[in-house]
């Protein structure tokens, strides 16, 4: 009987201490705006978390592989080291099952010939424990992977291609059978690849692609061309429209360089596009891309454009927009004004993920 009482007392004390520790940790975390969660080492260029579960997050490195934490960033472990490639360009999780992980390889944040190439796209059915190579070996660099929100067999891949000459294997690719076969659904020309891709959360047949003409050699970088800019599809990628027809820059009269796109989750009518041009230009549409308004030409939005050019929209506020560049920039009025915000870890801000179930949970790589 005495042993039983002691056991009960110890159990109660451990419960009290555990709850107290959790409350203390939550109090401390609640007072922090951003905290460094690692991992240290290589340049992180892709990031995503499991929606609704702050313990599970993934980070992809430019040439350092794929890393995962299951304790909110306290510990990280490599989960891609047994594969033939270590350059991670993009990550996405299936909305219907977050254990289904897709990874595009190769870096699209490029300013020199030495940037790491990839060898296609990979799929894990078990949260990164095992991997299957799903093709697209010659695409070179996949900067964005998007899994259809309700059908995990449908996946899109935005391929930039290599950067040293003409190539057929670039553009937007689509699979409808979980990667067993792929169809190139958007091809502009042999010198223009896909730098970004966004999907309308209310109508996944609507897609926006940011296309980029770039050539890099040992004596310099040539960014921009008539094929660059924003393209839109309303039929799941079967057909596309170059949105110079809606007033956006691009085409032979006003060629653009690297282009980023983002759609508001809370109001999918709102779409943003950021262009590398003479002065960076941030544009906004309030009607799914039918018409556009120039919001800003502030250089801060897009410094050193080929190396950055990525934007994100707050998940509960269509006027809340972020830009990843030399500085991490936020606007709360749709891009009219901006203010650089922390973190300033090393001057490299490449990617951002905001939890669709919790707008206060956000991560920047």
Predicted segment positions?
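Beta-propeller blade termini and top-face loops
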Residues: 22-365
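N-terminal signal peptide c-region/cleavage motif recognized by signal peptidases
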Residues: 16-18
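Bacterial N-terminal signal peptides that target proteins for export
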Residues: 1-8
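Short, linear, compositionally biased motifs with a strong N-terminal bias
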Residues: 12-13
